[in-house]
UniProtKB/Swiss-Prot annotation:
Monomer. The lineage of its organism: Bacteria, Pseudomonadati, Pseudomonadota, Gammaproteobacteria, Enterobacterales. This is Quinone oxidoreductase 2. Changing residue 139 to F: Almost no change in the Km for methyl-1,4-benzoquinone. Belongs to the NmrA-type oxidoreductase family. InterPro entries: NAD(P)-bd_dom_sf, NmrA-like, NmrA-type_oxidoreductase. Pfam families: NmrA (PF05368). It catalyses: a quinone + NADH + H(+) = a quinol + NAD(+); a quinone + NADPH + H(+) = a quinol + NADP(+). Keywords: NADP, Oxidoreductase. Quinone oxidoreductase that may play some additional role beyond quinone reduction. Potential redox sensor protein. Overexpression induces retardation of growth.
Amino acid sequence: MIAITGATGQLGHYVIESLMKTVPASQIVAIVRNPAKAQALAAQGITVRQADYGDEAALTSALQGVEKLLLISSSEVGQRAPQHRNVINAAKAAGVKFIAYTSLLHADTSPLGLADEHIETEKMLADSGIVYTLLRNGWYSENYLASAPAALEHGVFIGAAGDGKIASATRADYAAAAARVISEAGHEGKVYELAGDSAWTLTQLAAELTKQSGKQVTYQNLSEADFAAALKSVGLPDGLADMLADSDVGASKGGLFDDSKTLSKLIGHPTTTLAESVSHLFNVNN
């Protein structure tokens, strides 16, 4: 049995979609916080079990009979370390033999503040005695494209990444890699630095938005403090705004760049380009 935490989340549902191509539904366990959101998974024959990252006992119960676990990092930045400890402890108690974990690109040397909890989780895995693999994911293209509608409306894309190169890929690309690692043999003990095949700057993103929309969009680089303040002014929670601003500054220092093409090698095809992602965005919104 293969289990996925956060199975109905933004990455998790793509992982299950990819897994279903090669693994029978009867061998997949979706661990979810809210089973009501997993009715479609249950209808496909997938086992749905309820457990919250904060409830070690429920996680231990949910992991009974599971051999392999994909630990998708919690969405609660600042609470990730204790929550991941719960999952790892539960996996150990339930007899899970292998864990794949979605970490952060070059976590051990990353300038991003986000790296701290990932490094802590990686150490927990090393100390757990369970065989594991690290999926050090780079940035999701969707992270930046979420700001595209506002940029098109105002003609300005704001950020604090300077000329930093961002080797992003889509969630579906990263999910395909996770599905392969969790379902195939031979990946145990590996550390995969995963990122898109081609890197781009926010100036290039603005140019691509201009090209495909016909509306002029320029990139305006802000200081970390000013970018965080701008995000808060449109309603983002303080913690999220500060994290995004810190990540942009990290990108300016090379924190979101990698040119190894490990991701495309792992999934067997090129990663989704920026132009393709922008095109998809417009098709969905139209």
